[in-house]
């Protein structure tokens, strides 16, 4: 997904530094630009942040229109702070264009709003792993969304139980949110481990609590969409 403003800025680009989770179709907006892969791929190949900063500065000093293309929204787990600091250290001005973060793309694909009238007035976004490499799950909001959780689903189920979530709490897992092949499966805290197989090797977000509940109004649109979903086993 890309916003209209993002697409317009991309069309002007001379150089594009892009992340791993970028749809290749976006190249159509800037076919004449130089595209530089600076992606991080979980446990695979990753471009170090210092190297990304250096490439960004080099491109900005040589070209008038440079785009740093990120998946989702740059201000949500996008390392935006480091890159802004690098640019500001050299007196280089830039514009930050908002994007569609995975939590929102997942909510749209699953048709399960993150906030619900009367039951869901707070949302927490967090990574499944801390910066120390420890799996952590909390219960600080009505809806908890965990990013980059695909490899930790069985362990996350246990951590959610330890954090006080009842075993029957609704859980929604969406992998490759915002892509044409996005996949939604529905579970409970107790059965979350079942999501490991269908979402294997796919970037996933896990929504727990109010934002994972099914809508009570089964509209025709929702009914058609849910035909492609896996219902939870409690």
Task: Indicate where each model-derived feature is located.
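Alpha-helix capping/helix-boundary segments
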Residues: 22-23, 75, 102, 152, ...
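A contiguous loop/helix-start segment that scaffolds small-molecule binding in enzyme catalytic cores
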Residues: 51, 61-66, 79, 122, ...
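Short hydrophobic/aromatic-enriched beta-strand-loop microsegments
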Residues: 34-40, 91-95, 114-121, 166-173
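Class I S-adenosyl-L-methionine
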Residues: 4-97, 190-199, 233
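Short, charged, surface-exposed secondary-structure boundary motifs
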Residues: 1-2, 28-29, 44-51, 104-107, ...
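Class I SAM-dependent methyltransferase SAM-binding "motif I" and its flanking Rossmann-like core
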Residues: 73-141, 183-186, 234
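General beta-strand structural signal in soluble alpha/beta enzymes
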Residues: 18-19, 67-71, 94-99, 116-118, ...
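Short, acidic/turn-prone active-site loops that include or flank metal/cofactor-
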Residues: 21-23, 39-46, 100-102, 119-123, ...
């Amino acid at each position: 997904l890309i916003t209209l403003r993002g697409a317009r800025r991309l069309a002007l680009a001379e150089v594009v530094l892009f992340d791993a989770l970028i749809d290749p179709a976006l190249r159509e907006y800037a076919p004449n630009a130089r595209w530089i892969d600076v992606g991080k791929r979980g446990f695979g190949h990753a471009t170090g942040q210092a190297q990304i900063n250096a490439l960004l500065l080099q491109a900005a000093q040589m070209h008038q229109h440079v785009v740093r293309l990120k998946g989702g929204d740059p201000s949500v787990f996008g390392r935006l702070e480091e890159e802004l600091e690098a640019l500001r250290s050299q007196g280089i001005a830039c514009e930050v264009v908002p994007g569609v973060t995975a939590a929102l793309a997942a909510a749209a694909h699953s048709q399960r709003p993150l906030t619900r009238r009367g039951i869901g007035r707070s949302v927490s976004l967090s990574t499944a792993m801390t910066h120390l490499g420890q799996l952590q799950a909390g219960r600080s909001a009505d809806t908890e969304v965990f990013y980059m959780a695909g490899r930790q689903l069985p362990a996350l189920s246990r951590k959610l139980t330890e954090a006080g979530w009842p075993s029957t709490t609704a859980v929604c897992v969406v992998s490759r949110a915002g892509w044409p092949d996005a996949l939604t499966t529905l579970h409970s805290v107790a059965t979350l481990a079942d999501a490991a197989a269908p979402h294997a090797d796919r970037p996933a977000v896990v929504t727990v609590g109010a934002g994972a509940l099914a809508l009570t109004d089964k509209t025709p649109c929702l009914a058609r969409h849910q035909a492609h979903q896996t219902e939870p086993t409690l």
